[in-house]
């Protein structure tokens, strides 16, 4: 769809992008295990991007979303006719189909309290003509109560929050986090106001995604009945 002048849609490989940035020579890179950032890192500001596994769960709220598991697979051949990410509704949720330079990636998202894993695998592999599943990941949908913790630490990436990838909102959220961090660090706004701004953004993303489930799909199944029943307040 058309984008605003200041927006664009891109495909990129996160690992390769990270390698380009870290190898650019613009940054001093130190590889070490960090347990307590504020005690172990000498800097004015710390951006904590350690991911979802190091979180203090008392600082997080759950987001409303019907999904919690994804099966991953890949076809090791380029599809020249596929030039965009497909989002395909299935009886148990939906599947992303992403074109890569030399392959196509698949992700079958479902709720493991509604659909058994083997049932999901069988539907995934048969529906998309796949030979095998490469990985299975369970996830939570969540947001931090405060994006600034301690004296000088800003939560970023999955350390701040995560919501399922239906609208591919992660990069936009990370950019908004940077903007809010800047505003707080340089006293454009108070950190309390910045925190409220980024939480409002996350709630907007939650509601945008919930819109997709409100009217269901062509499938009359337990998953879609559950998804349609989720509390939803777009205001």
Please place each PLM-identified region on the residue numbering.
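A conserved beta-strand/loop capping segment in the N-terminal third of enzymes
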Residues: 1-14
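Active-site-proximal substrate-binding core of FAD-dependent oxidoreductases
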Residues: 182-227
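Tryptophan-centered motif/residue detector
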Residues: 1, 91-94, 141-142, 149, ...
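A short, glycine/Asx- and small/polar-enriched loop/turn
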Residues: 39-43, 148-151, 217-219
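A conserved active-site cap/scaffold subdomain adjacent to cofactor or substrate pockets
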Residues: 130-198
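Predominantly flavin-linked oxidoreductase catalytic cores and closely associated redox partners
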Residues: 13-130, 161, 178
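A conserved mid-domain beta-alpha-beta active-site/ligand-binding segment of alpha/beta enzyme cores
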Residues: 225-235
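A short acidic (Asp/Glu
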Residues: 57-59, 166, 203-207
């Amino acid at each position: 769809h058309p984008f605003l002048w200041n927006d664009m849609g891109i495909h990129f490989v996160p690992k390769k992008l990270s390698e380009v940035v870290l190898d650019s020579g613009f940054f001093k890179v130190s590889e070490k295990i960090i347990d307590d950032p504020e005690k172990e890192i000498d800097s004015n500001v710390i951006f904590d991007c350690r991911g979802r596994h190091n979180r203090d769960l008392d600082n997080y709220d759950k987001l409303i979303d019907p999904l919690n598991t994804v099966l991953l697979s890949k076809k090791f051949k380029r599809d020249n006719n596929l030039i965009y990410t497909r989002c395909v509704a299935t009886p148990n949720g939906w599947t992303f189909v992403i074109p890569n330079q030399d392959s196509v990636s698949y992700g079958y998202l479902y709720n493991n309290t509604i659909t058994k894993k083997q049932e999901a695998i069988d539907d995934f592999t048969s529906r998309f003509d796949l030979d095998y599943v490469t990985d299975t990941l369970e996830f939570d949908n969540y947001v931090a109560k405060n994006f600034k913790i301690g004296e000088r630490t800003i939560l970023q990436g999955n350390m701040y929050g995560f919501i399922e990838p239906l609208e591919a909102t992660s990069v936009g959220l990370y950019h908004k986090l940077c903007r809010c961090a800047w505003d707080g660090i340089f006293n454009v706004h108070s950190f309390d106001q910045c925190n409220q701004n980024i939480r409002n953004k996350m709630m907007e993303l939650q509601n945008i995604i919930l819109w997709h489930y409100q009217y269901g799909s062509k499938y009359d199944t337990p998953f879609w009945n559950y998804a349609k029943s989720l509390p939803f307040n777009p205001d």
